[in-house]
Amino acid sequence: MKFFIIVLIVVIAAGACTKGGKPSGVNGIVYAVTSSATSKQLVPAIDTTATAAFSGLYDETTNILTYTITWSDLWLDTKKDTITSIVFYGPATAGANGAVVRTLSFVSTNKAGSANLGLAGNTGLSDPEKTDFMSGAWYFTINTKRYTTGIVRGQLMLSQK
């Protein structure tokens, strides 16, 4: 009996595993979401060496966006600052400003680093937000105490996986 239970557990566990490869949602509609952010993309632009990168996945079926934001050189050592939030805006094309869609409170005193974040559940995208987001009309900023409207900006681009 003990052997039978162990075999049953192994069979169930093996059946739950995937082969790896491309991630997929319930029906396979998953998008890669990427962006390269700089201070030059802000409107109006500011002159800094700050950069950031956005790398994520959006599952259209579950309406979940998971992502990692990596940033560097947000400030000089002599002018320390603090990240206060990550803000999503839309609809707007590159070179234009949009309305605030989501503000995620996030605090870091590191001028370089990364964070794994997400939008899901109650904070998932509404239908109009989803339309704008999927058409590339969203951008994000990293806001700090000194740069309350953003020190870097990056337009979010989607491509189906």
Regions found by a protein language model. Give the residues of each.
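Sec-dependent bacterial lipoprotein signal peptides
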Residues: 1-17
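Metal-centered catalytic cores of metalloenzymes
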Residues: 17-86, 90-161
